[in-house]
C-alpha cells in the first residue's frame, strides 16, 4: 500500500499528546465497558512486547477508601477476570508496602497490570516505522476540503501552513482519523459522525510521588487515577462536555484544578504539598451512537465506519473512538478494511513486530551495551529513543553537553531530533526530546535550543519568533496553577526573557 499521512499540526498535537500516559490494563472499564476492557488488556500485553522503550511496567493498585463501598471490590475483581485482566485482592498493609505514597487509610486494594506509556516517543516510533515501510508523512498540512467525483471521494485539498500554499492529493481511499475533528472532516464528504467532545483536565506534578499507578476502586469518576510518568506524575482527569466550537481553545478552569487537587490528595496525601508544574486538557474523541446523540451511554470502544455502506459515500472510511491504549488495534481494523476494499490479501503483523527502538534488549541492557558506564544523560536518551540511540552522537564533550538540565537532554540528542525526526520548531522539539518539560518549563533551556534551531535553519529571526511562541505555550500551562514556587518561577522567567534578553510579545503558540 502506498500511504500518505496528513497532520494538521505536529504529531501528538491533539488528544494523543494530551492524555494520562496510562498503559491501561482495562480494569478501569471492566465493570462499565467490558468490550473496552478486553481491548485494553489485549493491547497492553502487545505494547509491552513491541514498544518496550515507550512503556514502563509499574503495575497498578485500585484502592478503596473509607468513604467508598468495599462491596464494589468483589464486583470489580469478577469483572476484571471476565475480561481477561489479572486482578488480585491484596492486604492493605501489603499495598502500602508496595506503594508507600498511597493513602494510609485505605481499607482495600486490588493489584492489576497497569503501567505507564509515553505517547510522544510511541508516536514517533510508529511514524518512523511507517516511513521505513514507504509511507509519506506531512505535518502542518490542514485538510480544507475533500475532492468528490459523483458519490466517490477521490482525494483531499490541504493547506501547507509552513509553505503557506494549497496542495491537492488524490487517492483510491481516504481514511478519516482526525479524532474529535473527524466530525468536521466527515461533513466535508457529506457524511455524519456524531462526536461528543468530552474535555478532560490534568495536573503535572514536579516529581514522582508514586511508582505504581494508583486508581480509586469505584466506577470511573473525576481525578481517580495517579500515573507515574518519566520524571513526574499526573493526576486526572475531569470530564465535561465541551461546545464543539471550543475544541481548539481549551482552558483549564480554577474549578477543575480544585477538583483534581482535592480528589488527588485522597489517593496520595503527599500531592497536597507537592509542587504542580502545569495544567493541561485534551478532548476525548467519543462517538455518540446514531440513536443516542446526547452521548449519555458512550463507550470508549473503537468505531470503524465504512461510509459506502453507511452513507452511500464511496472511497471514504472513518476510524475514531477508542483511546491511546488501543491505537494499534484501531489501525489494524482500518487497515484490514482498506486491504479488503483494494483487494490486498496480506495480514496485519504489527502485533508481533517490534517498533524502531524496541527491536533489541530493554533500555537498561541497551545502555550498558552502548556505553560501559552510562551516565544520566545517556540513560535518559535511551529511555526516549531505545536502540536508535546508537544514531545519536554523544561521544565528545560538546555533543554530550546539556541543553535541558531538568530532563538531561544533550546537544547531540537535539541535533539528532532536528536532522531525523521532522522538527520544525521548539514545540516539535519538546515532543521529541522533552526539552522544556521539566521543573523550569523551558526557563533555562529554551534559548539554548532556539540557538541550535537557528543554526540548523540558518535563520535567527525565525528562531527568535519561535522562542516567543514556545515561552507563551509554556505559560498557558502554568497560568492555571500559578502560585507558590510556580509563581516565583514564572516571575524569574519574565526577568530573564524580558529584562535580560529583551524578548517582548510573541505570536500565539501553534497548539492553542
Predicted feature residues:
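Dinucleotide-binding Rossmann-like beta1-alpha1 core, especially the glycine-rich loop
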Residues: 21-98, 224, 366-373, 489
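C-terminal catalytic lobe of FAD-dependent flavoproteins
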Residues: 119-121, 129, 187, 192-201, ...
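Glycine-rich FAD pyrophosphate-binding loop
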Residues: 1-19
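Short beta-strand segments that buttress and anchor functional surface loops
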Residues: 112-113, 156-160
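Core beta-strand elements of the Rossmann-like FAD/NAD(P) dinucleotide-binding domain
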Residues: 162-173, 177
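Low-complexity, small/polar and acidic-rich linker and loop segments
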Residues: 458-512
Amino acid at each position: 500500500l502506498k500511504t500518505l499521512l496528513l497532520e494538521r499540526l505536529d504529531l501528538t498535537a491533539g488528544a494523543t499528546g494530551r492524555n494520562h500516559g496510562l498503559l491501561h490494563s482495562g480494569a478501569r472499564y471492566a465493570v462499565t465497558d467490558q468490550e473496552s476492557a478486553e481491548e485494553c488488556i489485549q493491547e497492553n500485553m502487545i505494547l509491552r512486547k513491541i514498544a518496550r522503550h515507550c512503556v514502563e511496567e509499574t503495575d497498578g493498585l485500585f484502592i478503596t477508601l473509607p468513604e467508598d463501598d468495599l462491596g464494589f471490590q468483589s464486583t470489580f475483581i469478577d469483572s476484571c477476570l471476565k475480561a481477561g485482566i489479572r486482578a488480585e485482592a491484596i492486604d492493605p498493609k501489603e499495598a502500602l508496602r508496595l506503594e508507600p505514597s498511597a493513602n494510609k487509610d485505605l481499607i482495600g486494594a486490588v493489584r492489576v497490570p497497569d503501567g505507564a506509556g509515553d505517547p510522544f516517543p510511541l508516536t514517533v516510533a510508529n511514524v518512523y516505522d511507517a516511513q521505513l515501510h514507504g509511507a509519506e508523512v506531512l505535518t502542518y498540512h490542514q485538510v480544507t476540503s475533500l475532492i468528490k467525483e459523483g458519490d466517490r471521494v477521490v482525494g483531499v485539498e490541504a493547506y501547507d501552513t509552513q509553505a503557506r500554499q494549497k496542495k491537492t492529493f488524490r487517492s483510491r481511499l481516504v481514511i478519516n482519523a482526525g479524532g474529535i475533528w473527524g466530525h468536521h472532516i466527515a461533513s466535508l464528504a457529506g457524511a455524519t459522525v456524531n462526536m461528543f467532545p468530552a474535555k478532560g483536565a490534568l495536573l503535572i506534578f514536579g516529581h514522582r510521588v508514586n511508582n505504581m499507578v494508583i486508581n480509586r476502586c469505584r466506577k470511573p469518576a473525576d481525578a481517580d487515577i495517579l500515573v507515574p510518568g518519566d520524571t513526574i506524575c499526573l493526576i486526572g482527569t475531569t470530564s465535561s462536555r465541551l461546545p464543539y466550537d471550543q475544541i481548539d481553545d481549551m482552558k483549564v478552569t480554577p474549578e477543575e484544578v480544585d477538583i483534581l487537587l482535592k480528589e488527588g490528595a485522597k489517593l496520595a496525601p503527599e500531592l497536597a504539598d507537592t509542587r504542580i508544574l502545569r495544567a493541561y486538557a485534551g478532548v476525548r474523541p467519543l462517538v455518540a451512537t446514531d440513536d443516542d446523540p446526547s452521548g449519555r451511554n458512550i463507550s470508549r470502544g473503537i468505531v470503524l465506519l465504512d461510509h459506502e455502506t453507511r452513507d452511500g459515500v464511496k472511497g471514504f472510511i472513518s476510524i475514531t473512538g477508542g483511546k491511546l491504549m488501543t491505537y494499534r488495534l484501531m489501525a489494524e481494523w482500518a487497515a484490514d478494511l482498506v486491504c479488503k476494499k483494494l483487494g490486498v490479501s496480506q495480514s496485519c503483523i504489527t502485533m508481533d513486530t517490534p517498533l524502531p527502538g524496541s527491536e533489541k534488549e530493554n533500555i537498561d541492557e541497551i545502555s550498558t551495551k552502548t556505553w560501559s558506564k552510562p551516565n544520566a544523560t545517556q540513560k535518559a536518551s535511551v529511555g526516549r529513543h531505545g536502540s536508535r540511540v546508537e544514531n545519536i552522537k554523544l561521544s565528545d564533550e560538546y555533543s554530550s553537553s546539556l541543553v535541558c538540565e531538568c530532563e538531561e537532554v544533550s546537544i547531540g540528542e537535539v541535533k539528532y531530533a532536528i536532522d531525523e525526526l521532522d522538527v520544525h520548531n521548539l514545540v516539535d522539539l519538546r515532543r521529541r526530546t522533552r526539552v522544556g518539560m521539566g521543573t523550569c518549563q523551558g526557563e533555562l533551556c529554551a534559548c539554548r535550543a532556539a540557538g541550535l534551531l537557528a543554526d540548523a535553519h540558518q535563520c535567527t529571526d525565525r528562531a527568535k519568533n519561535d522562542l516567543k511562541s514556545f515561552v507563551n505555550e509554556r505559560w498557558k500551562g502554568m497560568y492555571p496553577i500559578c502560585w507558590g514556587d510556580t509563581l516565583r518561577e514564572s516571575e524569574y522567567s519574565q526577568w530573564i526573557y524580558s529584562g535580560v534578553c529583551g524578548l517582548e510579545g510573541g505570536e500565539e503558540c501553534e497548539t492553542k
